[in-house]
UniProtKB/Swiss-Prot annotation:
This is Tubulin beta 8B. Residues 429-444 have a biased composition (Acidic residues). Dimer of alpha and beta chains. A typical microtubule is a hollow water-filled tube with an outer diameter of 25 nm and an inner diameter of 15 nM. Alpha-beta heterodimers associate head-to-tail to form protofilaments running lengthwise along the microtubule wall with the beta-tubulin subunit facing the microtubule plus end conferring a structural polarity. Microtubules usually have 13 protofilaments but different protofilament numbers can be found in some organisms and specialized cells. Residues 421-444 are annotated as: Disordered. The lineage of its organism: Eukaryota, Metazoa, Chordata, Craniata, Vertebrata.
């Protein structure tokens, strides 16, 4: 089977991870003790993608939980699904990274890395046919960003031919927790460009907007935000876990979504958006799903897809629906909005359909777009980075842990290169449109 090992790093990564395991366990009818209580053979058929069977018929998540301070671990442990995880797979330090990328990467985090890699190896060895690794982390803090990227490079060294897929929570301009976020994020993106295969860029600002605008929640909590992220995460792996008419897996996604190796930063979306614990009253049609899915308000990254063009798109539908209708709708969207799709990739939309919908919905769709507008996120971080770095503000916290200023300069220029690469393909599409219009005028 095609197993996936999930590594959750830092406070943010662990909270998202814990929520994700709740969602997955619910879909496969596994209770908080790891026991199966379902009535469908489909739930058990491929349960070993995310779980392995322990003694006594208990199903244990293939999860590695890492943090440099014990607080989050304790709350996951005492949370609703805390007893499901293997106790050996909780690895925590004592002193925390203090929002410092250098601590997570070079000092505190580096000391823990070997014991984390031992657990990762153990999990990988218990797989029949390991598909790849998923990592949840935030880029604004110290552990998720510094130690998270360190683990990615270690995993890449040991498993060079396996897919590494990250769910990275980027700092957003309006919702800021820490002053040094731009430093941590830039240093992390520098690593992700080189070592990850697929990065799903999610940011809190977009999630807050979805909660207040679409779900009409007066005071959204992190629990509500994590609910949205976990819905997307579950959608991405759904084809591996349940049978479907058109399957996708992490590798197929990468092959269809990444036109050039560095451009692997995706904006995810989900439709229909529902708040925690609510039921949907009306079944959506495939047309409405497709419409919602491409709507800028449904994107989980705070950048407007209409400002860029889609290089590639993947759409994963869930629920019973006629394939023909799905194909028609996807064609219509591309046909009506052809200016938003790069026309030098002929068929740049990958579709997958899985028959089993998520709990409480008749059908749903997960959207993954590789859009040049994602550069807005990086540009915003880059501007803040430059403003601080020009004055060398807060730099002593990093150099004190053994970092060199040169690393900052390298990371900055690598991220700026990424922005200009996206811009270049954006411009290529715009130029082609102008040429076509010019040619039409000449003919006329």
């Amino acid at each position: 089977m095609r197993e996936i090992v999930l590594t959750q790093t830092g406070q943010c990564g662990n909270q998202i991870g814990a929520k994700f395991w709740e969602v997955i366990s619910d879909e496969h009818a596994i209770d908080s003790a790891g026991t199966y209580h379902g009535d469908s053979h489909l739930q058990l058929e491929r349960i070993n993608v995310h779980h392995h069977e322990a003694s006594g018929g208990r199903y244990v998540p293939r999860a590695v939980l890492v943090d440099l301070e014990p607080g989050t671990m304790d709350s996951v442990h005492s949370g609703p699904f805390g007893q499901v995880f293997r106790p050996d797979n909780f690895i925590s330090g004592q002193c925390g990274a203090g929002n410092n990328w250098a601590k997570g990467r070079y000092t505190e985090g580096a000391e823990l890395t070997e014991s984390v890699m031992d657990v990762v190896r153990k999990e990988a060895e218990s797989c029949d046919c390991l598909q790849g690794f998923q990592l949840t982390h935030s880029l604004g803090g110290g552990t998720g960003s510094g130690m998270g990227t360190l683990l990615i490079s270690k995993i890449r060294e040991e498993y060079p031919d396996r897919i590494i897929n990250t769910f990275s929570i980027l700092p957003s301009p309006k919702v800021s927790d820490t002053v040094v976020e731009p430093y941590n994020a830039t240093l992390s993106v520098h690593q992700l460009i080189e070592n990850a295969d697929e990065t799903f860029c999610i940011d809190n600002e977009a999630l807050y907007d979805i909660c207040s605008r679409t779900l009409k929640l007066p005071t959204p909590t992190y629990g509500d935000l994590n609910h949205l992220v976990s819905a997307t995460m579950s959608g991405v792996t759904t084809c591996l876990r349940f049978p479907g008419q058109l399957n996708a897996d992490l590798r197929k996604l990468a092959v269809n979504m990444v036109p050039f190796p560095r451009l692997h930063f995706f904006m995810p979306g989900f439709a229909p958006l529902t708040s925690r614990g609510s039921q949907q009253y009306r079944a959506l049609t495939v047309a409405e799903l497709t419409q919602q899915m491409f709507d800028a308000k449904n994107m989980m990254a705070a950048c407007d897809p209409r400002h860029g063009c889609y290089l590639t798109v993947a759409a994963i539908f869930r629920g019973r629906m006629p394939m023909r209708e799905v194909d028609e709708q996807m064609f219509n969207i591309q046909d009506k909005n052809s200016s938003y799709f790069a026309d030098w990739f002929p068929d740049n939309v990958k579709t997958a359909v899985c028959d089993i919908p998520p709990r409480g919905l008749k059908m749903s769709a997960t959207f993954i777009g590789n859009n040049a507008a994602i550069q807005e996120l990086f540009t915003c971080v880059s501007e803040q980075f430059t403003a601080m770095f020009r004055r060398k503000a807060f730099l002593h916290w990093y150099t004190g842990e053994g970092m060199d200023e040169m690393e900052f300069t390298e990371a900055e220029s690598n991220m700026n290169d990424l922005v200009s690469e996206y811009q270049q393909y954006q411009d290529a599409t715009a130029e082609e449109e102008e040429d076509e219009e010019y040619a039409e005028e000449e003919v006329a």
